[in-house]
């Protein structure tokens, strides 16, 4: 992200980054221990809850750090990608919380299914999906060795807004799955999310028209998208 924003953070100021990395990994270990052993000893759910809380908090802290860096950096065409990263970082705490809820011992099956679907929507479509799509905004033309097409940044920001809205609607619809119309709302949320993806796809196709991918890496990325 520093390269994208063209900023240089001195080594003496990297204490926060190191703390986040070590604490995040510790939280992941605690979370895994809780998930593995709480079935035999339900009281160990506290480890699952603590681990999920730490993971969510560290990633959110990373999002705040990125937000501060954006405010300090000069305007850049790569700024759109950082916006995607910030949005994704702020989604993970909610995904982690929903994941912790699904692991609660004795949770009723219907609630478990609803929380699980919401957890998957936030983490897969939100945290992972938004991060990957944001990377492609700038990485795709780089792989093709060409420039970003006109209006790509503006379109990508609107696509991000739609993707966030789609994730939010889908997750809330899953949580309140017993409410009449929730399934329709969840489908509508997915549709909105897909519209955001299609907007990014249009950017990718327009970029590809300036220079067609002739090597395996860009072809595989395009096929994967």
Regions found by a protein language model. Give the residues of each.
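Hydrophobic alpha-helical transmembrane segments of multi-pass integral membrane proteins
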Residues: 1-225
